[in-house]
Regions:
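Short capping segments at the starts of secondary-structure elements
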Residues: 43-47
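Charged, amphipathic alpha-helical coiled-coil/dimerization segments
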Residues: 17, 67-127
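Short alpha-helical elements of helix-turn-helix
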Residues: 3-7, 27-38, 63
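Helix-turn-helix DNA-binding motif, specifically the short coil turn and the N-cap/start of the second
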Residues: 57-61
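Hydrophobic residues on short alpha-helical segments
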Residues: 37-40, 99
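Residues within the alpha-helical elements of helix-turn-helix
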Residues: 39, 54, 72
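Exposed, interaction-prone assembly regions rather than primary DNA-binding/catalytic cores
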Residues: 123-138
């Protein structure tokens, strides 16, 4: 059972998450906020709904995380005067500045995870995992 692919993938994901969580904590950033920051660094000015969809979480989860991120000064939420229905999320300078500190941590985790592995095997593993994701899309 422990050698089944699903088990190995889950354990590897847990190990990656655990390592990154510890590194992020040194900067006072939670793993939950990391996902939203990564998305916003690539696509600032999303609605809460768009952010939820891209992060793959429910809107109440996003709303709670954004409330905390706003209190920490990472983001601002705004409504347009002509459309008060949608809430848009914007990074603050503080939220943007975190990128320079946090992205190298994620890169370091990925490097540590594949240390000693042949680059061709890492590339093959990545292709297989991407194929699994594609095959099991809902």
């Amino acid at each position: 059972m422990k050698d089944r692919l699903a088990h190995v993938v889950r354990e590897a994901a847990r190990a990656l998450t655990r390592d990154l969580t510890a590194r992020l904590a040194t900067q006072g950033v939670s793993f939950g906020h990391w996902a939203f920051l990564r998305i916003l660094w690539e696509s600032d000015n999303l609605t809460q709904r768009e952010l939820s969809e891209q992060a793959g979480v429910m809107e109440p989860t996003t709303a709670a995380a954004l409330r905390a991120m706003e209190e920490l000064g990472y983001i601002e939420r705004r409504q347009l005067p002509e459309n008060r229905k949608n809430v848009y999320v914007h990074l603050t300078p503080r939220g943007r500045a975190l990128r320079a500190k946090l992205e190298p941590m994620a890169v370091a985790v990925n490097k540590a995870a594949v240390r000693g592995a042949d680059p061709a095997e890492v590339a093959a593993c990545r292709r297989v995992l991407l194929g699994i994701l594609e095959n099991l899309k809902a």
